[in-house]
């Protein structure tokens, strides 16, 4: 957990304690957020490219349900 930012560690603790809901389809959750980021014209092109690359890489390597 040390390599992740403070906000991620905070949300992790909230989920682990039951204060925040757990999403069983974690890969689907990640892909949904990355897709939203990649499509968001208000974000910088660099951030959108990072989100698109991460989502595409995840689809190729780990998310073979479709």
Swiss-Prot record:
Entry-linked InterPro entries: UPF0253
Lineage: superkingdom: Bacteria
Pfam families noted in UniProt: UPF0253
Family listed: Belongs to the UPF0253 family.
Protein name per UniProt: UPF0253 protein YaeP
Designated gene of the protein: yaeP
